Design a protein with these regions (language model features):
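Hydrophobic transmembrane alpha-helices and their helix-loop junctions in integral membrane proteins
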Residues: 1-202
Length: 202
């Protein structure tokens, strides 16, 4: 039952290899809809996986290991796809996949801690995962709404065609810069905080 639940919720969360809908849905949706996909819909899938893992009785070790492996694959592949992308909304979608993987690493560490009866691992993994889930939702909303504003003003989503946007849209550009710095996990911004807690669990 747990495995079937992970497949179902993993499809909703966009965990690789169940991510096929994510880039197209984000690239073709309006900016507010894309922001909702990234910050609400996909996160519900992660919370569903966590709920299954916590309420499924004594979590065996392989549950945690499976979540860790899926998290590593999703984070790595999502980051690679993001590096090759020029459509700004599709790039943000692939970066969302990377962060879904990072959050899943935290949740997987917490579930592994439950199986091994390690309170520190449980606390760091679950706290880091949930904290980064919240932080990612905040800065990714800013980025998708900023990308939508840029597309509305310029008619372009191709990053290569957005040169000089800082002069045309200074306020949006500053907001996007802050969001991008958080996305890059630069301290002291919120993108750094959750990832730091997750990394402490390893």
């Amino acid at each position: 039952i747990w495995l079937l639940g992970v497949i179902g919720f993993g499809l909703l969360a966009g965990i690789i290899p169940l991510h096929g809908w994510v880039p197209q849905a984000h690239a073709n949706a309006s900016a507010p809809a894309a922001a909702l996909f990234s910050t609400v819909v996909m996160k519900i899938g992660l919370l569903g996986i966590l709920t299954l893992s916590l309420l499924g009785g004594n979590a065996p070790l392989w549950w945690g290991v499976a979540l860790l492996v899926l998290g590593m694959i999703t984070a790595f592949v999502g980051g690679l796809y993001a590096l090759m992308e020029h459509n700004i909304q599709r790039l943000l979608a692939y970066h969302t996949l990377e962060n879904i993987g990072i959050i899943l690493l935290g949740l997987g560490a917490g579930v592994t801690g439950i199986a091994l009866n390690q309170p520190v691992l449980i606390a760091l993994g679950l706290t880091g995962g949930l904290y980064h889930l919240l932080n990612h939702s905040l800065f990714k909303s800013v980025l998708f709404l900023g990308a939508g504003s840029i597309w509305f003003r310029t008619g372009h989503r191709d990053i290569e065609k957005l040169g000089g946007i800082g002069k045309r849209m200074p306020v949006i550009s500053i907001a996007m810069l802050v969001g991008l710095m958080a996305m890059a996990a630069l301290p002291p911004l919120n993108g750094f905080a959750g990832e730091w807690v997750i990394y402490q669990s390893f």
